[in-house]
């Protein structure tokens, strides 16, 4: 909430806050390959990401009006799991967890991860990677903002629309 609260203070009344970042359903294929290679007894090797519901709750907690969080999944095909991991490292998305595995990851383990990834998620001559992109929008409160109408003030019966 700290960054959101700072953003709120920086905005003018009725100012728009807009942010994009990875959501909780990012890289399920890579997570599964790591878990299977370690026989399901692994420390997390991929940083956790926030889910849609929690992102919306953070916007509300920071005091934003009209908060909305949208989710979009993008699928990218990489030449191999190693190309995907290089892409993640170049993007600066390495595991930031404090309780992550501290020892060296052996070559055989990483080869097994790549093998499992290719077996389970091959597509178009490469491997599929799914990224969930969350878009957060919220407005700094202002008296000019649209307000919800009173309950029961609608002119059309909802059952007529259906």
Each PLM stretch: what is its role?
Residues 14-83, 91-103:
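Conserved catalytic/acceptor-binding region of the Class I
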Residues 2-16:
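A short glycine-rich, Lys/Arg-flanked "PGG" loop and its adjoining helix->strand segment in the class I
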Residues 5-7, 36, 154-155:
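Glycine-rich, phosphate-binding/catalytic loops in enzymes
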Residues 5, 57, 115:
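Active-site phosphate/pyrophosphate- and oxyanion-stabilizing loops and adjacent acidic/basic residues
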Residues 3-6, 20, 42, 87, ...:
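Generic hydrophobic/packing signal
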Residues 62, 82-162:
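C-terminal lobe and adjacent flexible extensions of AdoMet/dcAdoMet transferase-like proteins
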């Amino acid at each position: 909430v700290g960054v959101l609260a700072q953003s709120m203070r920086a905005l003018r009344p009725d100012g728009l806050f807009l942010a994009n970042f990875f959501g909780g359903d990012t890289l399920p294929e890579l997570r599964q390959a790591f878990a299977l290679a370690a026989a399901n007894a692994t420390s997390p090797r991929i940083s956790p990401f926030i889910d849609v519901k929690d992102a919306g709750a953070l916007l509300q907690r920071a005091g934003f009006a009209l908060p909305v969080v949208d989710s979009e999944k993008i699928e990218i095909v990489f030449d191999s799991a190693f190309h995907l991991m290089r892409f993640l490292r170049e993007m600066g998305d390495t595991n930031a967890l404090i309780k992550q595995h501290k020892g060296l990851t052996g070559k055989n383990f990483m080869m097994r991860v790549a093998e499992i990834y290719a077996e389970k998620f091959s597509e178009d001559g490469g491997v599929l990677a799914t990224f969930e992109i969350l878009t957060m929008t919220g407005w700094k409160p202002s008296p000019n903002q649209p307000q919800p109408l009173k309950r029961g003030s609608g002119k059309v019966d909802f059952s007529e629309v259906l």
